[in-house]
Amino acid sequence: MKSLFRVFFLMLAAVFLALPHVSASPVDSVDPSYDFHQIKNVMIYDIDLTDSAHTDSEAASLQQNFHMQAAKLLEIPSIDKERLNRKISLAIGRDLDVIEKSDVEEYTSLVKDNLKAVADIYVHSELVSYTIGTYTIPAHTDWKTVTEYDTYRDSNGITHTISHQRTVPIFVPEQSGPYTNVKLRFSAYDAKTGKVIFTREELRQEQDSNDRLDTYNKIVRSYFRDLKKKIK
């Protein structure tokens, strides 16, 4: 019997190793000295999609979902790049959209010098991984406890039933399925100093799912929900 249970535990270990890893929690870094309560508005840059595989329509959906959830969850005024350019253009009397097309270095310098006038913090984000994988659980043997009954008659002709349990092997064939593999990085900066105040890296893998956008949205919601908690 000991040898049977030893085989069972070895097979069980093989099954767990075959499953895709699920991150238990995001990895955060927070500046403990920063006063998040003084934040009144935030600049949300488009998420960087450079290192992830996606179509043009997927990219548009990713950006739209990202900004929509950030604005909804933060519950404080948030601005995107279009509004940022407009606000700074009005403040300095020059058209930032035109400058960005003709001189990227000057545009970057003007934004850096004037960002603090329109936002308290700004957030840069990056989509690192956006894929669908396949997990495989090898064929293995499970063990099931079954109850068996024996009936007999005693010397007086009375029928009795006794039960006893035993463990029996159950063969489980190989199984496979999809899982989403989505990883994002977030970095929030103080607009006045450029100092990093809150970063997060989160990998989420969801078994039996091929809905990458749903997994992506969960990560985005988690970050901005937690940022809101710090601000409140």
Model-derived regions, located:
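Bacterial N-terminal signal peptides
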Residues: 8-20
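Bacterial N-terminal signal peptides that target proteins for export
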Residues: 1-9
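Intrinsically disordered, low-complexity segments enriched in Ser/Pro/Gly/Ala and basic residues
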Residues: 2, 22-24, 101
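C-terminal/domain-edge helix-coil "capping" segments
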Residues: 23-43, 132-232
